[in-house]
Structures are given as C-alpha cells and as structure tokens.
A protein has these predicted regions:
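Glycine-rich, small/polar surface segments that engage phosphate groups of diverse ligands
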Residues: 30-103
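Generic N-terminal amphipathic, Lys/Arg-enriched alpha-helix
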Residues: 1-17
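A short, well-structured juxtamembrane/interface segment
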Residues: 17-35
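Glycine/threonine-rich flexible loop motifs
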Residues: 112-122
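Short alpha-helices
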Residues: 131, 140-171
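Surface-exposed amphipathic alpha-helices with a cationic face
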Residues: 59, 124-132
Length: 171
C-alpha cells in the first residue's frame, strides 16, 4: 500500500512539474559550461548527499567543472568549528573565487528561511553569489523559501503530500 501511494505521488509530481523551468535550468547549466564557468553544488542533510553524487554526473556526463564543499570534510568541519555553520559555504566560495562566470546549484527541501533561522548557510552563499554576479539555480521542495524567492532559475518540486515533502523533493 505504501509503495503504491508513493509511486502515485511521484507520477503526480512528474505530471505537474514546471517543464519550462526545467528547460531554463538546462540552458543555464549549458551556458555555465560554454562560458568556462564552474558549478558549485550546495545542500545539507540528504541534499548534501545528492550534491556529492551530482558532482560526478555534471563533470562526467555534462562536461561542467563542478565542485561541492561537502566533499572536503576536513575543510567543512574546520570552517564550521572556527567560523560557524552560518558562513561555512560562503567562506568556501570566497576562497574558491566565485565569480560572474560561475553558478550555484542549491539542493534543498525548504531552501532557507532567515526568519526561522533555517539553512542560513545557504542564504549567505546565495547573497555572496548575487553580490559577485554568479547565477543562482535551485531544486527545492518549497516555493516559500529563500532559494525559491531569490534564485535566478529554481525548480520547485510540486507538493503532493505534505508528510513526504523531504523524500519526494530529495528523490
């Protein structure tokens, strides 16, 4: 019963996802590659795992120079310890010399919420990207989060079951 319900929800998402936004995202990613920019993937929790895996796919299958701070546990934990979790990604992006040729791709269920002090690290990274002229892309599970409201091209996974937003968004 659970599997059938889950698969129905996945089908509903596939029917209702904004295909035009997915096409715009693909065009943005191709543009990053064509101008010699780099793609930086950011996410926390399960989305961090998606980032780590996606680095391989974007590099190997798409030919895009791609990185994620998630893949360097030593630096990630040192920055968290010494500078704080809120700036862990923006500090890493500064050292990486994020610039106007580059793009962030945020994987997140909520996308960040300053008022609720949620995923401030993503918000600070987006602010830095905007200040430096880099593009901000996202795949998120909520249309009300910081990423959806401030990104340049953001695919919002249609919410079909509030109780399963996380697994449906991260899947």
């Amino acid at each position: 019963m659970h599997v059938e319900a889950f698969l129905r929800e996945v089908q509903e998402i596939a029917r209702n996802i904004d295909g035009a936004t997915v096409e715009r995202m693909a065009a943005e990613l191709a543009s990053v590659r064509d101008r010699g920019g780099r793609l930086f993937l950011l996410g926390v929790g399960g989305s961090a795992g998606n980032c780590s895996h996606a680095v391989n796919d974007f590099r190997k299958l798409c030919g895009i120079e791609t990185y994620s701070p998630i893949d360097n546990v030593s630096e990630l934990t040192a920055r968290t310890n010494d500078e704080g979790w809120d700036t862990v990604f923006s500090g890493w992006l500064e050292v990486s010399r994020l610039n106007k040729n580059d793009a962030l791709l945020i994987f997140s269920v909520g996308g960040g919420d300053a008022a609720r002090n949620v995923s401030i690290n993503l918000i600070r990274a987006i602010e830095l990207a905007k200040a430096r002229g880099a593009r901000v892309l996202g795949i998120v599970g909520r249309s009300t989060g910081y990423t959806a409201l401030n990104g340049d091209v953001v695919v919002v996974i249609p919410e079909v079951n509030p109780g399963r937003v996380t697994p449906l968004s991260e899947g």
